[in-house]
Amino acid sequence: MFGFQRIGDQIWAAADQRPRGFLPGATSGRTTLGGEGLQHQDGSSHLHAATIPNCMAYDPAFAGEMAVIVDRGIRDMMIEQKDVFYYVTLMNENYAQPTLPEGVDEDIIRGCYLYKQFTVQQPRACVTLLGSGAILTEVIQAAERLAAQQIEVTVYSVTSWSEIARDGRACEEALLNEAPEPGIPFIYQQLGKSKGPIIAATDYVRALPESVRAYLPADRRYMTLGTDGFGRSDTRAALRAFFGVNAETIVKAALLALK
């Protein structure tokens, strides 16, 4: 239940033996299990998971995303007979589970899909918000507040930072090897549907969203928010305010990036 930060070496040893299966991370993020303090709150597991080549790591925010990921995992491991295993972080927070947009299943597996566009009449600016797992609800609240200020917002749910980064690296390697069709990073393509500076917020250390910086459009400012440091014992709201990953801080970051 304490994530890769406690048992990472055992998972690495297992990876060498080509395991298959689902490994649920039952304390997703550093602010989700509010009273456990610095010992048990997990802010780095997805960084550890990204270092293991046959580990598919996901941080879903909604039950619909989870269903898509589990379905693909079963197909990969049982039908396609791939020697991979899935690390999926879970939450224990109660909030509404929306219906997923049509046609996003493959985007969920690849790591990022367009969740919603908050359009306004005669917007005075545009901004893009990326959120994952426990913090996506804070991102959505921030988008609503920004839209109330006549700022148009595009929200993406990032289901896997590590899969996005791996895709970007594969495109870079193809370029280095002079492949005839090296491809365009998936996250670069996805963000083509949005405008303005990009703000990313997660319940993990900032190094996680920073891992995709190289594959974003170079002409757009990118700011990351995360939970660097030790965990603390407090309520979810207080923890998210302390680490600066709550809706209020996301709004402030977006307004700062627009200056």
Predicted regions and their residues:
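Active-site nucleophile and cofactor-binding loops and adjacent substrate-binding regions
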Residues: M1-G3, A26-S28, L38-Q39, Y58-A63
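Short, glycine/polar-rich helix-capping loops at beta-to-alpha or helix-loop-helix junctions
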Residues: H40-L47
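Long, structured ligand/cofactor-binding scaffold of large enzymes
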Residues: M1-D16
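Short glycine-/polar-rich loops that comprise or flank the Walker A/P-loop
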Residues: R18-G21, N54-C55, G196
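A generic local secondary-structure boundary/capping motif
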Residues: I11-A13, H46, I74-M78
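A glycine-rich helix N-cap at a beta->alpha junction
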Residues: A14-G29
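Alpha-helix C-terminal capping segments
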Residues: A13-R18, A50-I52, A147, V212-Y215
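Thiamine diphosphate
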Residues: T32-H40, A57, E65-I69, I74-K259
